[in-house]
């Protein structure tokens, strides 16, 4: 039967990509339907109970800056928070949180159920409705047909998924859930280029059977033994969200005996016996892969991470495996503190279908089928954070298409999301893709701390950011701007500053007049110290500093919430200290952007561009990049190729046309 109501956007899948896609489209005013095989698993953390990390935390902050759910849900469910790389530069600092699976999932479900314009329906999707070269809806396993103008497919590991434990395997989307076999077959009928990837998960341990006295303790920030100060928050709105109880993680290690046990199972490993065809993630390898690849290393760190506050289940991060269960049992018990460990769930590998993201347009719509968008692991990525960012992006662009508006694509210098999308659609994947700060050439501009400054205004323009977030953002931005201007206007004369005061705060006496902004650029000078100069005569009463503990409660000295004070000071300091480096990066961005967004003719026959090598013509014909910038990042396309292509376009297609003139004007 046809469902009586028609929708603007249908989202298939209720994982991290699907929930963000559905929320984004609904917030933009589109009638959105989220189809999931099980409402109880909305926002399920299928593998590790953590959010964030290097590069990944940056994506979470960007999703949050545009009104997404992941960071807020993490603040509600986070049971340990840490700032990674805290002693390094701001570009590579990242937030990571352990989350209570139940609390996290509950937060996501509440947001979904309370979002206007968003409907839920529990049924697996077996087919897509396609008319001509455009998708018009989805069909569930019992034949219910839902019509929509666009469909966002976020199938995770469910497409023809197969679980492996030793030489045994069975069809599954993840442990306990069936695979999407019919939907996978349907997508293959559409002739979309596809392949197989795999990922894995470790056995889960009953914490009551672990002797933690033999393990190292790893407290979170703000906990006894951890980095002093307040417990971090993930969301820019997180100051209003109380964290649950904070708990430590623990550390044990593999040893030579562990490695011998693992090697003894190689002959029954699906990875080494050819049972698994899919390629696994390079940066999250199985324990057997680690032992094989790093044979000279005699020990590996294993993190024992609590799954939640109401369970004893422990996630041993570092021993993801598809080895036979008897090997899993022995290797777990070979580690210190784990001698009597009881396994609650076996580890496994899962292989699944993905589709080549180079077959997507820049808005994540498939080239072959109009209105069909892909997001998450179906695009060859790995990780909750990468999935959430893609889901939001696809949901935004599906909604924009319904509204007959131009697609949105952040540039590589604007967001890690821009880096992620650009990498996928130009380079494709040969293994599961995960985000790192090293993938962003302009990472000094793409920090966690300024994600709101980069993206919240755009989120508001798109209809994603509510009034509360918008007001909070404007308040922060205005305070930062006013205080920055104040520091530039305040000058200190050496005749009016005692040498002892200058030495205390600045390290040495000053010999000429400086404004406070210039002094703040010095490496060893911080804002609080600067405000304490000469008895605090330069302090701003609106921004309390000194030795007071900036906690998450409202400061008694100011109407500003203390978490806002902290973020304002952070912005002012980073902007001052890295201004020169950021200016240099901006020059690089301008230089690179001269031709970056220059549109290439959709009907250009590259095979007829005789000046190009045959390989270049083939690659450009295959990928059909939309802009010159995208063309430059295709594998095998050299700067010389781009120059020759420009000559051809100027000579034959762009003569006396707007694209050429505007590009030359920029140059």
UniProtKB/Swiss-Prot annotation:
Pfam families for the chain: GIDA (PF01134), GIDA_C_1st (PF21680), SAM_GIDA_C (PF13932)
Source species, domain of life: Bacteria
Residues annotated as binding FAD: 13-18
Residue positions binding NAD(+): 280-294
GO-annotated biological processes: tRNA methylation; tRNA wobble uridine modification
GO cellular component: cytosol
Keywords (A to Z) from UniProt: Cytoplasm, FAD, Flavoprotein, NAD, tRNA processing
Cofactor(s) essential for the protein: FAD
Compartments where located: Cytoplasm
Main location: cytoplasm
GO molecular function, one term: flavin adenine dinucleotide binding
Subunit architecture: Homodimer. Heterotetramer of two MnmE and two MnmG subunits.
NCBIfam families named in the record: mnmG_gidA
Role: NAD-binding protein involved in the addition of a carboxymethylaminomethyl (cmnm) group at the wobble position (U34) of certain tRNAs, forming tRNA-cmnm(5)s(2)U34.
PANTHER family: GLUCOSE INHIBITED DIVISION PROTEIN A, PROTEIN MTO1 HOMOLOG, MITOCHONDRIAL
Family the UniProt entry places it in: Belongs to the MnmG family.
Entry protein name: tRNA uridine 5-carboxymethylaminomethyl modification enzyme MnmG
The species this protein was found in: Polaromonas naphthalenivorans (strain CJ2)
Name of the gene: mnmG
